[in-house]
């Protein structure tokens, strides 16, 4: 029996001739007994889910030297995360990995305000005030 495939939480389509796609997996704030741990590590689950949905070739290879020559930017992926989880993810995911995967983060704070982080902003430590 095949496993049932679920879609992403948010799918956006746009760009020229609707040729750009943005897939976003979301993990909200937890209120469970172990909420502190869940809120800080929730990004791992979201990242795993989004990676399993990446069925598109992420890069092209040069015919002359076999090196990676370009990244497919038509498909972008995002993590919608509670700010504590986003803070950890931004520090732990290397910028180079985020760039190849076209991975973005949408961080939501307790007031419901959203901050957007592009792949070039990954691999850095951000203090609470940035969120």
For each feature predicted by the language model, list its residue ranges.
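Mg2+/Mn2+-dependent nuclease catalytic core
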Residues: 29-56
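Conserved catalytic cores of phosphodiester-cleaving nucleases, focusing on short active-site segments
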Residues: 10-14, 18-34, 53
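A short acidic/basic microdomain associated with nuclease active sites
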Residues: 1-5, 9-11
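Catalytic phosphate/metal-binding cores of nucleic-acid and nucleotide-processing enzymes, i.e., regions
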Residues: 6, 22, 34-39, 44, ...
């Amino acid at each position: 029996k095949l496993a049932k495939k679920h879609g992403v939480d948010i799918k956006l389509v746009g760009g020229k001739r609707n040729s750009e796609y943005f897939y976003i997996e979301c993990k909200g704030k937890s209120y469970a007994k172990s909420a502190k741990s869940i809120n800080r590590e929730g990004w791992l689950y979201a990242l795993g889910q989004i990676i399993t949905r990446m069925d598109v070739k992420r890069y092209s290879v040069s015919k002359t030297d076999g090196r990676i020559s370009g990244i497919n930017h038509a498909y972008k992926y995002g993590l919608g995360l509670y700010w504590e989880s986003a803070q950890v993810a931004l520090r732990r995911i290397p910028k180079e990995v985020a760039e190849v995967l076209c991975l973005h983060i949408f961080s939501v704070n307790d007031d419901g305000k959203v901050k957007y982080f592009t792949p070039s902003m990954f691999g850095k430590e951000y203090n609470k005030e940035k969120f």
